[in-house]
Amino acid sequence: MGGKTKKHAMRLFDRIAEKYDLLNRILSFGMDTKWRKRVVELILEVNPEKVLDLATGTGDVARLLKRKAPHLEITGLDSSSKMLEIAEKRLKDGEFIVGDAHNLPFYDRSFDAITVAFGFRNFSDRRRVLRECRRVLKRKGRLVILELLPPNTKRFTGKIYSFYLKTWVPFVGGLFSGDFHAYRYLSTSVLNFLTPDQIVEMMKEEGFEVSFEPLFFSVAGIFIGDLIW
């Protein structure tokens, strides 16, 4: 992604910051909170002390983590300053940083665990982000990615979901937010995203031991990447 495209994406997320949580409700059939709670469970399995929440947005995962484990030191990073303004208001004792996931501003082996909820598909160079995650994770660290997945149109449920993404999401999201372009872009980002097998393979190639949990007819999925050294 060139500088121009990155700026365009940043502006887009700044524009929809106030309505971003609504977008997630629409895209996930209202199940995104339940899915985030599963991410938190998976992170807490490794008993972390320091957690990085990439593409933190309005800080939903960071808040859930802090609620479950108040002792955690949580850092949220996002390229959208408007999103982070909301996150900071909602979680006073978290650290939120404007930054680029492709060039993380942290020392090697800084975190016990990393989360990415609904942000991985928006990264321009996903391999580079995975390498950065591996760099800043401590030994035996864990990366958990929650992401919406493209419909499998060979299945009836996939055809319904495809129709939903192409028509209902841009219309309803645009109607509520007044920004039809942003919601059309976000629907397209799901439709054009990698398959679960492709994501699993990419994570393995970048040094993670990977497991995958499909969610709700594979509308979404959780990818768990563990460093085995």
Swiss-Prot record:
Disulfide bonds: none annotated. Pathway: Quinol/quinone metabolism; menaquinone biosynthesis; menaquinol from 1,4-dihydroxy-2-naphthoate: step 2/2. One of its GO terms (molecular function) is demethylmenaquinone methyltransferase activity. Belongs to the class I-like SAM-binding methyltransferase superfamily. MenG/UbiE family. Keywords: Menaquinone biosynthesis, Methyltransferase, S-adenosyl-L-methionine, Transferase. It is an enzyme of class 2 (transferase). Signal peptide: none annotated. The keyword S-adenosyl-L-methionine applies. This is Demethylmenaquinone methyltransferase. Pfam families: Ubie_methyltran. Gene3D superfamilies: Vaccinia Virus protein VP39. CDD domains: AdoMet_MTases. S-adenosyl-L-methionine binds at residues 58, 78, 100-101. Methyltransferase required for the conversion of demethylmenaquinol (DMKH2) to menaquinol (MKH2). NCBIfam families: MenG_MenH_UbiE (TIGR01934), PRK00216.1-5 (NF001244). It catalyses: a 2-demethylmenaquinol + S-adenosyl-L-methionine = a menaquinol + S-adenosyl-L-homocysteine + H(+). Its EC number is 2.1.1.163. GO terms for biological process: menaquinone biosynthetic process; methylation. InterPro entries: SAM-dependent_MTases_sf, UbiE/COQ5_MeTrFase, UbiE/COQ5_MeTrFase_CS.
